[in-house]
Curated annotation (Swiss-Prot):
Coiled coil: none annotated. Residues 1-47 form a transit peptide. It is found in: Mitochondrion. This is Elongation factor Ts, mitochondrial. InterPro entries: EF-Ts_dimer_sf (IPR036402), Transl_elong_EFTs/EF1B (IPR001816), Transl_elong_EFTs/EF1B_dimer (IPR014039), Transl_elong_Ts_CS (IPR018101), UBA-like_sf (IPR009060). It comes from Heterostelium pallidum (strain ATCC 26659 / Pp 5 / PN500) (Cellular slime mold). The gene is tsfm.
Length: 354
């Protein structure tokens, strides 16, 4: 029976699942991608006839694009194992997916901070949900962009804002920042936006200290919903650099915790002071709220201000310390967040049903 069936099949050309034809040679079914042997014991065995192993290509494509394994495999199959065409195919697929989520509100997210050898970057990256923003994939993207920025030529000698769309391509993968975001959107199925970036390069500036802090319950100090960078300068003497670094870090923590807006009284806009006076508010009350140097220092002694603490530590270290600048980020600040009132929604439905 087996022989007669095989004889009949050998006279036929059968279509396979992808529409190409199967032919027979030496009792075997043959096509471009697979064959199976028909044994007398009626066992069927499938073999790959594709000489090129996909595993190394999939690995390379994953490194380039961070796309899921199944997407990398599909891209290679669709493009006949051409790695460049497969990369372009995945980028186009990612853009198509990202466009579907582009109009969704992004008010959650994370603050990422990287400080290394006198250089520092702080950025805010937003997502739709807090769940995604706390995930490893989202934070890895924020870290990757932070470090790409740190190694770029966009950093100034003073703390300054950088436009997100000017950040250089990520050298390790050859992808732009936009490509990295698109790939992650396709993977997480949520809209993602790089909202803002500040950075400084003080690596060649003498007597300058930079520090950063992100408030994270897990204790990483790199990611959180609040973060800050601060720049200090010192003049004279040979102070303990470790002590200066600790002071800068403590001030960065204070900035995150208390939330000042300006370094000194002199930097407060006149319009803000006029508004306080018009509202019969004492200027000192305003300064306590918005001026860093006038605030009670959270790491200080005997209820001292930040200014008093800096003066005290300057004397201890026999140098003159100045807070030059700082920046503070809070996730979603200034953005309108939709608040769901499910109770009101239920009552509205009940009233409509009456």
């Amino acid at each position: 029976m087996m022989r007669s069936t095989l004889s009949l099949l050998q006279k036929c050309r059968l279509p396979n699942n992808n529409g190409s034809l199967l032919s027979f040679k030496n009792n075997q079914v043959v096509n471009q991608t697979a064959l199976f042997s028909m044994k007398s014991n009626q066992q069927y065995r499938f073999y790959s006839t594709d000489v090129k192993d996909l595993a190394p290509l999939i690995k390379e494509l994953r490194n380039r694009t961070s796309a899921p394994l199944k997407d990398c495999k599909e891209a290679l199959i669709q493009n006949k194992n051409d790695i460049e065409k497969a990369t372009s195919w995945l980028h186009e697929k990612g853009k198509s997916t990202a466009n579907k989520f582009a109009d969704r509100a992004v008010v959650e997210g994370t603050i990422s901070i990287v400080v290394n050898n006198g250089k520092a970057v702080i950025l805010e990256m937003n997502s739709e949900t807090d769940f995604v923003s706390r995930g490893e994939t989202f934070r890895a993207l924020a870290d990757q962009i932070s470090r790409a920025t740190l190694e770029s030529n966009l950093l100034a000698q003073s703390l300054a804002e950088i436009k997100p769309d000017t950040i250089a391509p990520q050298p390790a993968s050859g992808s732009t920042v936009a490509d990295l975001i698109v790939g992650t959107v396709a993977k997480l199925r949520e809209n993602i936006r790089l909202r803002r970036v500040h950075a400084i390069d003080a690596s060649n500036q003498p007597n300058t200290i930079v520090a950063g802090y992100a408030h994270d319950p897990s204790g990483t100090n790199q990611f959180g919903r609040l973060g800050s960078l601060v720049q200090l300068q010192y003049e004279g003497g040979q102070p303990d650099i470790a002590a200066l670094n600790q002071l800068a870090r403590n001030i960065a923590v204070h900035i995150v915790g208390v939330g000042p807006s300006y370094v000194s009284i002199e930097s407060v806009p006149k319009v803000l002071l006029d508004e306080a006076i018009a509202n019969k508010r004492h200027p000192n009350s305003l300064y306590d709220e918005v001026v860093l140097l006038e605030q009670k220092y959270i790491s200080g002694e005997d209820n001292e201000t930040v200014k008093a603490a800096v003066q005290r530590i300057s004397k201890q270290l026999k140098t003159n310390i100045t807070i030059k600048s700082f920046v503070r980020y809070s996730v979603g600040e200034g953005m309108e967040k939709k608040v769901e009132n499910y109770g009101a929604e239920v009552m509205e439905k009940i009233n409509k049903a009456k």
